[in-house]
Design a protein with these regions (language model features):
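Acidic/glycine-rich phosphate/pyrophosphate-binding loops and surrounding catalytic core
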Residues: 2-209
């Protein structure tokens, strides 16, 4: 499955390096204290529940970033429906590297697969209609790229990535601006000043009962 445009090499490297810094710090002392440095082992990622698999591509990047000598054999790809007991991939190499990256990889894949599965199931509910399922900015701080990537893998659509790539006026904007007319008028003026010659409007109808 192709990556969405916002999953860039730079973003991946930044995300992975920061996560490793947070978790590993100056070293995985439990592993270094108990596992020989030259030990080679084989590990399998076994699926624990039926789901839409997500995070395999990310897992490969994580393993390669930490230890380029690890060998990974992918058996299931992102977006595939997998069943309990299936093996997603196999990793062969330094036992220390595998153990140190194990939880980081599992955390990402568990969360991403859960999101992808929920997105897939929700899209199925509106299949055959004109309704589109979009995500939001209500994401985990510093994990947005991965969560939106999971939505994409699950078959739903990504909305704006951040505050910078799309204007979306909500009730708070309208209240502070003095009403929806004032808010929209000011926004149109702002866009013209910025050299934007077109706008897209959408109407959200919500049951506030």
């Amino acid at each position: 499955m192709n990556r969405p445009s916002y999953v860039t090499d730079d973003r991946l490297r930044h995300f992975i390096s920061e996560a490793i810094r947070e978790d590993v710090g100056d070293g995985d002392h439990s592993t270094m204290a108990s596992v020989p440095a030259n030990m080679i082992r084989r590990a399998h990622l076994i699926i624990k529940d039926d789901c839409i698999l997500a995070g395999v591509d990310l897992a490969l990047e994580i393993f390669r970033y930490y230890d380029k000598d690890l060998k990974i054999d992918v058996l299931k790809k992102d977006g595939e429906f997998v069943k309990k007991g299936d093996i997603a991939f196999e990793v062969v190499g330094s036992a220390r590297s595998i153990l140190t990256m194990e939880r980081f990889v599992l955390n990402c894949m568990q969360r991403m697969s859960g999101i992808a599965t929920y997105a897939h199931d929700t899209v199925k509910l509106v299949e055959g209609t004109i309704t589109k399922i979009l995500d939001t900015r209500k994401t985990t701080p510093n994990f947005r790229m991965c969560e939106k990537w999971a939505v994409y893998i699950g078959g739903a659509q990504n909305h704006r990535f951040g505050l910078y790539d799309m204007i979306m006026l909500k009730d708070n904007h309208n209240d502070y601006a003095g009403g929806i007319t004032a808010s929209v008028t000011s926004t149109v003026k702002y866009l013209k000043e910025k050299g934007k010659d077109s706008t897209e409007c959408s109407l959200d109808i919500m049951d506030r009962r």
